[in-house]
Amino acid sequence: MAINAIIFNSARFLGPAVAGVVIARISVGAAFAVNAATYVIFLIAMLNMRGLPALPVGATQSVLKASAEAYVYASRHPGIAPMLLLFTVTTIGTRGFVELFPGFADSVFGRGPEGLSMLTSTVGLGAICGALWMLLRPAIAGLTRLVLAHTLVISLAILAFTATDRFTLALPCVFLAGTAMTITGIGAQTLLQAAVDIRMRGRIMALYGMIFRAGPAVGAVLMGSLSERFGLRWPLAVGALISCGFWARTRLKQRRMAETLEADPSVAPVRQPG
């Protein structure tokens, strides 16, 4: 997972840097054309994959029933439930800040496309550093504490980002946020996969993936709408403060969460739904 994060965030670091140059020297349309061309390479790689193992097919089940079972399982788990709830709040409250970079780069810092490229690339660079650090971390013990601590770091970094008018101070803030986001993302995914019953793993990870992808988008839309009335800073700052509040609430459950998330699920089973 750490290697996957390194690859993903390397692209996130290099992509905006290239896009900034293409937009500045050619046009926005040219940047989209280059982006589309990269997907062709991905499709060719997918078509050339061979020898994948066949997975056993279980009894068919309706999507609604399978989703309901996953929700019940997650809500009854003393580690997964608070982790997913905190992750939901923080993804909506803080992680959409990357989608707001165009507004900050132009309206707040007055840097235009090149400033946008620098902000996005700095987040990606921080994410790579976080992934490399997680790659060198050998054990799952203590991972719950690490994830919760860096969840707070994200919120504090975003608060500092919204409080400054200086571009040179904003860059370290987004670097720190990018580092913490990757550490929490890899850490939470590792804990969930380790703790969940194998029969529910796919559905729980799908729930995690839905939160991971939809949360920032929902947060960006919500904060973008509020920014028309309150400006860019206040909605993002309030989202970070709400995330801090949920972090404090979840922190009280850290010991119990660690006992279940860092243990073998066969040793500490969760009562199955139904």
Model-derived regions, located:
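Alpha-helical transmembrane-bundle signature of multi-pass membrane transport and export proteins
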Residues: 1-274
